[in-house]
A protein has these predicted regions:
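Helix-loop-helix "hairpin" substructures at the membrane interface of multi-pass membrane proteins
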Residues: 76, 137-218, 222
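Short loop segments and helix-boundary regions at transmembrane helix junctions
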Residues: 32-37, 78-121, 212-215, 227-248
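Transmembrane helix-bundle core of multi-pass membrane transporters
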Residues: 91, 95-160, 190, 214-215, ...
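Membrane-embedded helix boundary and interhelical linker motif in transport proteins
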Residues: 31-86, 133-134, 239, 266
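Transmembrane alpha-helical segments in multi-pass inner-membrane proteins
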Residues: 199-203, 209-275
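Membrane-interfacial amphipathic/re-entrant helices at transmembrane-helix boundaries
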Residues: 1-23, 51, 59-64, 126, ...
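Alpha-helical transmembrane segments within multi-pass membrane transporters and channels
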Residues: 27, 60-100, 105, 148-149, ...
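Cytosolic-side transmembrane-helix boundaries in multi-pass membrane proteins
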Residues: 172-179, 183-186, 245-248, 260-306
């Protein structure tokens, strides 16, 4: 094991972590803000990349392609929202149904299981080859970091508006929100649309970065997103109390996840076990608060002092 091999691979892992960090922020919005487990992510993570690649191949600019990808993701979130709120289907099952439908949609969009986009023929915003030895303004890490800062600023502003506060209230206490006259169904649909729009945007960047879109590129995306959320909260939760900083901690969690993943690969551990390791990491971090409350919390005293 050559340590230089690991050091050379870390910038690429950081870049990939940042790209997936945008997806993780989308997962955070449904998982923590709306209190909904949205499994649409696995399908949307392919849809965004598929739309972006096909738009680029049709001659559109990279910005138009990414905007179209984001719109496609929002439509996927709209479908899940309609299944859940207006058809009464449980959120988890609604996400699975949309994810299942998106598999066929993604095949139709690309015409086959995968579609490559050549960085020499198309003007891409990010690329694997732009991680090292390029001017800083062309560096993938710098570009995606700017994206994340701008997105967090927009989300921080939005969730401070009346509509954003209604959305947060819906996730916190839907019954009280309805009593205050908030249309919780509309808020849930809107939250799912925003979340899946961010996931699709991340997918569009990932497709450019790796040079192709694949119908299976979203497999296990929800596990990666949850891992980033849980790791970010576990490490930075006691430091970052502001909403914007909490979103930033999710992006940091994604970076740490991919840095650890790269280290695991460098150590020679079988890559077939990576998904299992990811699932175990998420399970353990989710169990920690429960274990702390059950086994390590001090018993509360009842009654007055004698």
């Amino acid at each position: 094991m050559n340590i230089l091999t690991l050091i050379n691979a870390l910038p690429g892992a950081a870049a990939q972590g940042l790209i997936w960090g945008i997806m993780a922020i989308g997962v955070y919005l449904t998982f923590r803000i709306l209190d909904v487990a949205d499994l649409t992510v696995d399908g949307t993570m392919c849809t965004g990349g598929a739309v972006c690649v096909m738009m680029l191949m049709s001659g559109h600019s990279v910005w138009v392609s990414m905007l179209a990808a984001t719109g496609a993701g929002m439509l996927a979130g709209l479908a899940t929202g309609i299944f859940h709120t207006f058809m009464g289907i449980p959120a988890i099952l609604a996400g699975i149904l949309t994810q299942l439908g998106l598999y066929s949609a993604n095949l139709k969009i690309m015409g086959k299981a995968n579609q490559a986009v050549n960085g020499n023929k198309f003007d891409l915003l990010v690329s694997l080859r732009n991680v090292k030895n390029v001017p800083f303004y062309q560096n993938t890490i710098f570009i995606v970091a700017i994206f994340i800062v701008v997105l967090i600023a927009i989300l921080y502003w939005f969730f401070g508006t009346e509509l954003g506060c209604s959305l947060r209230a819906t996730g916190c206490n839907p019954n009280m929100s309805r009593a205050q006259g908030i249309n919780t169904d509309v808020c849930k649909v809107l939250g799912l649309m925003i979340s899946n729009g961010l996931v699709a945007l991340s997918s569009a960047l990932l497709a450019q970065y790796q040079g192709f879109a694949d119908v299976y590129m979203g497999r296990g995306a929800i596990v990666i997103g949850l891992a980033a959320v849980i790791i970010g909260e576990a490490i930075f939760g006691k430091i970052f109390h502001n909403f914007a900083l909490r979103l930033l901690s999710v992006a940091f969690g994604s970076i740490l996840y991919y840095l650890v993943l790269q280290t695991v690969i460098w150590m020679g551990i079988d890559t077939d076990l990576l998904k299992m390791l990811s699932a175990l990491v998420v399970a353990v971090f989710l169990a920690v608060p429960y274990w702390k409350a059950k086994y390590f919390s001090k018993p509360t005293k009842r009654g007055g002092n004698k």
